[in-house]
Amino acid sequence: MIDSRQIFKYRIKLIKQAGALPIHELRVKLQEILLNSKLPFEWTKSGPRLVLGPGEKQTDIQSDCQYVDIYFNRDIREHLIEQELGSLLQAEGYEIIETEQIPYNLCSVESLAKYVCYEASPIALKGDLPKELLMQVNDKVVNLRSFIKGLKALGDNKIEIIIELSALRSIGIEQMLMKLPCLEVKSTGLKLKRKALLWQDSTGAFRQI
């Protein structure tokens, strides 16, 4: 059991420069940078503990921003984090523009996700998806069909379904869709297996958190 009183959480906002390291490689590079730093980061089985979040479009400066939560086992001043990580991240095309210590229990950057991706298998349907994909949420019945942002055939009678979380207008339903590993749609025999949380970059492409 993790004692939250001994863990300190910092949210860093990075600005992406031209020629920057691709976002899908950023997590590994961040862990490598932390390993070579003097910072008291929190360990996990896979290395320094961090969570990479979705990007954000900065329209005034036309540059992508990226959030990351990093966990430390000791309270540390924000400027020391920037001092240790700043130049190394800049070499990879990212500049730190904001560092803030936040409460340990504050929602992770994962909560910045706008979409959730499901794989549907098997498809007990003929032809297109029905107009109603009903899901029971407590005392409510939600039609997921209304919130589908994208569909993609994967072969082997499987499809990929992307659902827009913010369109649901219910924090409870959003949280459930983000956390439940599997959903079963009423009356269709369709089972949805959660694959990933997604965000959409400035080009409109979906990227995994």
Q: How would you name each of these model-derived features?
A:
Residues 106-123, 198-209:
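Short, low-order "capping/linker" segments at domain edges
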Residues 41-72:
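Short, charge-patterned binding micro-sites
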Residues 66-73, 116-122, 159-164:
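Short cationic amphipathic helices and targeting signals
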Residues 6-16, 68, 110-124:
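Short glycine-/aliphatic-rich beta-strand segments at the starts of folded cytosolic domains
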Residues 4-7, 19-22, 44-49, 126-209:
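Core RNA-modification/binding signature centered on pseudouridine synthases
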Residues 1-32:
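Short, extreme N-terminal leader segments that mark the start of a protein/domain
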Residues 28-40, 83-91, 178-185:
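Short, intrinsically disordered, mixed-charge
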